[in-house]
Amino acid sequence: MKISNASLLALLLPAASARFVEQAEQNRVMLFPDGIPEEPKSTTKYHIELSPGDTRWVTEDEKWELRRNGQRFFDITDHAELGTFNKRPYKKSVFPKKPTQKKDLEPLLKNLSKTEMEDHLTTFTSFHTRYYKSESGRQSSEWLLKQVRDTIKAAGADDTVTARHFEHAWGQNSIIATIPGKTNATVVIGAHQDSINLWLPSVLAAPGADDDGSGTVTILEAFRVLLQSEDIIKGNHENTIEFHWYSAEEGGLLGSQAIFTTYEKARRDVKAMLQQDMTGFVSRTLQAGEVESVGVIVDYVDPNLTDFIKKIIVEYCDIPYVETKCGYACSDHASASKAGYPSAFVIESAFEYSDNHIHTTDDLIKYLSFDHMLQHARMTLAFAYELAFADFAKLEKGHGDL
């Protein structure tokens, strides 16, 4: 069956544009007179894991078809060994019984800025796509690294705090910013920087405002304000804090798998990992008559870390949380979990009310709430600061209420 350009666009573009496409169909307007741009074809096979032990080999087109149907997965083609290097006996994760740093955090929380997040997100979404194999995806990563380094320099922290690319073969690199503490015990805050249009990833625009531009700028803002603490930039805190911006999450958690494979091989002591993926969309929650809240993922996460994050939300956020589920391999925290590290994930809402514009040309800033993103930034900043000063050695020995 031959399909016209206009008919194909009706499938590719947001529903809001469908009326224009229908009119073009009636008038036989050729929107692509030279033909629909073709996605580069590849016969390469990729090994994916859809659930524990459920693997198959697929083409790249089949990967995107699975994603369009809502199926998430690890692409384990190059990372089949993730989770096999850490042979230490299982040790139950332990976290503080309650938040203890509110006095020091209160002045910092007041410095979080919606304007900073909006300015960064406006530029970040101006790249045609942040698809991890694209040139604009590479450029967006370079731009983001510069913002992170500029943030460090503006804080006067460039003698101690570092930011670097974690390089990948596909061109768009992940980014790791490190705030050294007194010990090598590490707390990780993550988001993914790439975007995708699941119809023609190499061709169509993917502004990715919510997925995951919102998470990217949310943790960048938490990072900026965290560096306003003299104790933090002087390294007076116990634990090393890392902020990660992962490449190629949309391709099957590729960037985070590469990083956590390296960490697992090196026996890095990661105490906690929190992922922020989609932090700005609340419309469907409110339309359903539900209370604005943040969504705490409760499947395929560390329950003790998740309970601690709930306490952080209650203590430091102005809105409540709701428990929700997102399935296997639904974001980069899954890579940390697979490596044996306690991980957690907080999203913008109950999963069923999350943003329905993602992976299209219509994932735009106009649908987002920066007030809601501010709540995620408050949680992220408080999480980082509280665990920066946690004495995990004492906690793991069962001493004290730290």
Curated annotation (Swiss-Prot):
Cofactor binding annotation: Binds 2 Zn(2+) ions per subunit.
Positions with a binding annotation for Zn(2+) 2: D211, E250, H359
Pro-peptide region(s): 19-92
GO cellular component: extracellular region
Domain of life: Eukaryota
Sugar-bearing residue positions: N111, N184, N304
InterPro entries given in the database record: M28_fam (IPR045175), Peptidase_M28 (IPR007484)
GO biological process, one term: proteolysis
EC class: hydrolase
GO molecular function annotation: aminopeptidase activity; metal ion binding; metalloexopeptidase activity
Coiled-coil annotated spans: none
Residue pairs linked by disulfide bridges in the UniProt entry: C326-C330
Signal peptide extent: 1-18
Keyword Hydrolase attributed: yes
Subcellular location: Secreted
Entry similarity comment: Belongs to the peptidase M28 family. M28E subfamily.
Function recorded in the entry: Extracellular aminopeptidase that allows assimilation of proteinaceous substrates.
Protein name (Swiss-Prot/TrEMBL): Leucine aminopeptidase 1
Source species: Neurospora crassa (strain ATCC 24698 / 74-OR23-1A / CBS 708.71 / DSM 1257 / FGSC 987)
